[in-house]
Amino acid sequence: EAAPILDAYLQAGFVFVAFKLRGGAGVDEIHPVVLRYRGSEPCVPIRLTRIAAVDDMGIRAFFLGQHRVAPTNYRHVLINPIQIDWGALAANYDAVVTLAVDGDEASGHAFVTEYAGNASVVARNDVEPPGLDGAAFVGLRANAVVAELVRQHMLDCSITDDLGNTFDETGGPCTALHPLVGPLLEEFFPTPAWTTPAEWWRDLDGSEEYDTTDWPAEEFAARFEERIAGPAEHAGDLLLANVYLTRLYTTMSPAEMTEDPTFHENPMLPPVSNQFSATVVSDCDGPTHVELADGRVIQYDDAGQPPVFEDMPYALAVEQVPSSGAPMVLLDHAAAIDDELDAWNAAQDGGCACRMVALRSDALVLFGLFALGARARRRRIA
């Protein structure tokens, strides 16, 4: 299956870089690889992905730049919020996206925008923890490495009491707080077969056996700088240099992975909030209902269950986004969706009561994508 896919890339003049995992090496030794090339058209090589893909596989792409990013050769889809199961904290979100991008005019080649706006939504400390310093390991005794990693917030070896208060910073089993810290420690201090990495790193701290400077500290420091501190600093610099962050999402099955999506910036596109919200209202005088952020209401049935709209579109609209100007709407289901919703609501018996705010719950799902509020109504007592 791979041969024709690779041949298609070669016929188009693509260049490949191949990597082979060394014999005996584990997957934990695989490190991120960054390739830089001149170009102005970001691309996700999705055709290669189909070799090992599964049905409805989630694909999320982040873009840092000066403006919002949109797909070039794929469609852009707005999902229908009425099909979201708000009462279950949007547990069916992936299914809604899948059905929306698989619908008419999208045909499995489309993305939804989950966020578009100021890149400051990601704090620099989240990608570049303060205090990272490879030079701190130079000249350090081997049995002090764990303590230094704890100090730089790369390991957590703390012991806490029942109230969550820390009373020992390095006395407990250690957990790596960065995916490359564990492999780095294993490279220089391999875990014996009779124990676990978490316990071994704890025992290594202050160990008399490793109370020595006769170990490749400079090499460890260089690896730490190359794999952890340096990339973190670069990520922080990228956040500072690019004011706009776009997050796109889709799901695809192997049969749909026939074209690599490309992307472009469009300075005229509006921002997209990552707060996709609704309010669930429980009414003592009638069925529960949901109030969407745009003011529309979804009535529940008399049993307190949300409606199931089997024939209602999952896409609110399907668009083609140019490099400048407003999106071109290829398919607009808004009127049909409203008609079906109105017909459902008209068939339900709604109660009447005074509204009181009883609960506000912000359930941040998928990068703060959803916020669910709940309010209760009760009768006014004279």
Predicted features and spans:
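Accessory, solvent-exposed terminal regions and/or long lumenal/extracellular loops of proteins
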Residues: A3-N345
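Extracellular cysteine-rich microdomains
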Residues: L149, C352-C354, G368
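Compositionally biased, charge-rich terminal segments
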Residues: A346-G350
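Juxtamembrane/start-of-transmembrane alpha-helix segments at the extracytoplasmic/lumenal side
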Residues: C352-L364
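A cross-kingdom C-terminal cell-surface attachment/processing module
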Residues: D362-R379
